[in-house]
Amino acid sequence: MSTFALIPAAGSGSRAPGERPKQYAALAGRPMLWHAVRAVCVPPVERAFVVLAPDDAHFAAEDWSAFGERLEPLWCGGQSRRESVYNGLVASRDQWDADDWVLVHDAARPCLPAQDLQALIAECSADAIGGILALPVADTVKKAAKDESGRHRILATEDRAQLWLAQTPQMFRAGLLVQALQRARGAVTDEAAALEQLGLKPRLVAGSRENIKVTWTEDLAMAESILTRRGESIR
């Protein structure tokens, strides 16, 4: 039984404008994707697959030599995260067993702390289903709807005691995840949602606020600050 990582990186990153896809944005001297790969290319993870768009011309222009044979690009990305993860698992099927663990990690999470990754692996390795890194919601959460003029109005206040913010990596048995993604219906924005549709209840492992997802342009400065403080900036 082994552990491998898979990073879906076929998106265009439309909310973080620029000439290059968001995952290749410069961050602490490297592309953001490089930092995401570095975060998961550590023991016990034996290999990392990066799922790219079929027409991706940026990956080959970057230096990935630090990862050696542990990193393998797959040009089989789909139109959605679900398609990209599923396609990546199918394309790499001859390199893993159904009981192996797969860690699916966002290309836009370059600041994953090492202790968060190790906590996830330690707490989920003996779990029958697997689980995800997540944060308990600290802010008050409002449910909203638009009024007749298009302005957002509060409908209700949600019980934040039951709410968590999903992060990555998300860790599941590879065979089970393929089955879940294959059967999933409707909008599936993360792997846990596909498992939920099978009636399963993945575990929640508390992560940290440093594991930010770079979504907006201003998030890049925050990620840069985190990496620089850790001494992971390359100049």
Regions found by a protein language model. Give the residues of each.
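Generic C-terminal helix-cap and adjacent flexible tail
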Residues: 94-98, 146-149, 226-235
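Short aromatic-hydrophobic micro-motifs that form the base-stacking/packing surface
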Residues: 101-105
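Conserved active-site beta-strand element of glycosyltransferases/polysaccharide synthases
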Residues: 202-206, 212-215
